[in-house]
Amino acid sequence: MTASKTKKSKSKKKKNVTKKVNKINKPDIEKITVNIGVGEAGERLKKAESVIEDITGQKPIETLSKTTNKDWGLRKRMPIGCKVTLRGKRATEFLKNALETRENKVADYSFDEEGNLSFGIPDHTLFKSQKYNPDIGIFGMDISITMKKPGYRIKHRRIQKRKIPSRHKIKKEETKEFFTKTFNVEVIE
């Protein structure tokens, strides 16, 4: 009897338990794609390539048209734009500068259901490192941020490729939370 009384007499202490965050559920930036669509080949495209290389510090590749459109004077596989893919430290540094041009504000509709973020910058001279040059002109750009979680490798690997289960996919709300905490982004509804 004394043993049962001592067990009952011990009071359970409530611990201040903080919710543990599973590291495999923490989203991160996989890549940032910066695109300038010029719509034509030639000198204007070369100027756009020099602008994007100056801003990102990386050499761009040309994007090609997929179809022929006689009204616009396009042929299939004709160079019509340029893009750069940034990863790692370069990506985060560029993203800080790009968000600074938008005053750290992003619209809610810029986030998609898979947790990615896309927005545009109407004028490349909004970057602090750029000044207006009448010989080059003004170029706008599209910025797409692709998000990932640890374990996303299974959808890209060659052997035993798998789909990401829905419970592990990045949700729109997780991405918003990531950008507000990491980059102090204000999401405008």
Predicted segments, located by residue:
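Ribosome-associated RNA-binding proteins
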Residues: 2-189
